[in-house]
Amino acid sequence: MAFINREILTFNYPEAKGVVVCGDIHGAFEEMVFKLCVQYGMTDTLLIVAGDCGFGFEKSGYYEQVFNKISRRLTKANNWVVMIRGNHDDPAYFQEQRIHHERFRSIPDYSIVTACGHTILCIGGATSIDRTYRLAVDSRPHSDQTACYWADEMPYYDEEVLSAINAQFKVDTVVTHTSPSFCELITKEGLMGWAKRDVTLLEDCEKERAILDRIFDTLFEAGQPLAHWFYGHFHQSWNASIYGVLFSMLDIMEFKEVLRE
């Protein structure tokens, strides 16, 4: 169930008995649901995908076909899947909530999710380091209206919405696609080859991380009871406690539970 509260979109899952965050899935929806419901045998669980879900690479009808394949398994296990946008997603699928089934939905940036006593802030977006290649692919004629790059992929800082969130909610968990600059990955080794062909790439990647820094600072300075911060994007796994917050970078299809305090 969702409702608007001073422009804050809130999704509540009162039946959930557990919350898990998943790293990038890159279109492997059926594999993700199999892992959740069968391989790990989870039930009564809310799964939040931290971006790069894979929306926009196929026609919209394709994703309805995917849901039809996975819906029975989700219902039987009483599980739910909520997805935020990555850089490898069409932002319209999230801003417009084009996927809006009870057990399988995409949500906009700055949505609040509540479950198991947790109040979870969800913010997507990042920079595609291979965007020159993707732009070249998209420059070719496409009869099916699909794409592999979206210019509005970056995260954005919304001071007004964050102020409203700080006034109305006690946020203990944050799920983003990328991370603040003080978290891994810090090395730029993987960027240098692409940066030779993309003169603003390094600058844009720094801007991306600076935006996440501002989001963290705003929440932290407001006294939010932050305990967990999950993100994907970098295709590696890492955990560290910084400023009293446990930051977890999730690898592709990696699951990590949001523990109760």
What are these regions (language model features)?
Residues 28-30, 56-58, 90-94, 113-116, ...:
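Short catalytic/ligand-binding loop motif for oxyanion handling, primarily in non-cytosolic enzymes
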Residues 39-43, 166-169, 223:
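Glycine-rich phosphate-binding loop signature in dinucleotide/nucleotide-binding domains
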